[in-house]
C-alpha cells in the first residue's frame, strides 16, 4: 500500500504525534494484559531514538465523550510505560493547546476520548490535534477501522501524515496474505454465528482455495450438507446461505470442506462428557462443540500443503479442556506448515498463546475489528487517508 512510513522520515527535533492503541484491559485500576503496550513499544522507542519530540495519543474504554473520568484515565498506562522505557513518562491532562517535549523524549496525552469531537471525527478537533505536531504517525492498527478525530481528521490536516512501524507491518502482512498470496491460500474462519461473519465468509469464499469453517459457524455448513446438528447452536435462516457459499466456493475452483467427525456433549459445561461422533451420527440431544480427530487430520493435511494461511476464530469451545483438542491440533498444524500465516482476533490469539505456538505463526495481528474489516474487503478509513496524503505529497 502506498503510504508514507515513519521510518522514511527525519524526526530529529520534530514534534511527533504518535497515535497508538493502548486500550488495555483494567481491573480495579490495574492492567491485566499489557499486550498492546508491548506491541507499541518498538515504535515509541524508534521515534524517541530518532530525536523526535513525541506526544503519544490513545483512547481507553468508552467514557462519556468530553468528560474526564478517572476510571478511564491512562495513568496506569503512563506508569507502565515509565517502567518499560526506564524513564518518567508524564501523563498530560491538558494538552490540546500544546505541550513542551524535549528532543528524544515522550509524554503520554490523556485519553483522547475525553475530548469533544473525537468519535464524531470533527474537523475542529482534527485541526487542533494537527496543530500539535509537525508529523502525525498513525500506528494504531486496532483503531484503523474507525474514522475518528485522532485516527482520521488529524491525518487530513497534519503537515505530514504517515504510518508507524506497527501499522506498516500489519499492512505488509495483510497484503502478503491477501493481495499477493502464495497458493494454495487457505482461510480458517471460526466463531459462534454465521451472521456475524457473513461478509467475511462471502469475500473469502471467492478468494481462497480452501475455506475451513469451525465453531458454531460450521454447524450451518454441516446442516447445509444434509446432516443433523442436534441441539447445536446454528442459524436456521442462514442454512441456505451456507449452501450458497459452498456452491460459490466450488464455482471459483475452491472448497469449503465439511467436518468428517465431531466432538459432541450434552451441554457446554465443566465436566460435561465429550464423545466423538461421525458427522452423520449426531444425536437429537447432543451439541457439536469441537471437530473430531479425523477432521483435524484432514485439516492438518490441507494446512501443511498451503502456501498462505489466513486465520480468524477457533474451531471448538477450547476454553473447556474436553472441547479443545481440535483447536490445539489446528494451532499445531498452522505452526508446522511452511506457509506464511497470519492470525487475528481475540479468541484466535488466546488459542495461539494457550497452545504455545505464537512464535511459530508468521504474523499475529494486533487488531480485532480492523483485521476483520480488512478480511471482509472493506476500506479502513485511517489507512485510506494516509494513502490519500501520500498521493498528494
From Swiss-Prot:
GO terms for molecular function: ADP binding; ATP binding; phosphoglycerate kinase activity. Keywords: ATP-binding, Cytoplasm, Glycolysis, Kinase, Nucleotide-binding, Transferase. GO terms for cellular component: cytosol. GO terms for biological process: gluconeogenesis; glycolytic process. PROSITE patterns: PGLYCERATE_KINASE. Signal peptide: none annotated. It catalyses: (2R)-3-phosphoglycerate + ATP = (2R)-3-phospho-glyceroyl phosphate + ADP. ATP binds at residues 197, 319, 345-348. Substrate binds at residues 21-23, 36, 59-62, 113, 146. HAMAP family: Phosphoglyc_kinase. Monomer. Belongs to the phosphoglycerate kinase family. This is Phosphoglycerate kinase. It comes from Nitratidesulfovibrio vulgaris (strain DP4).
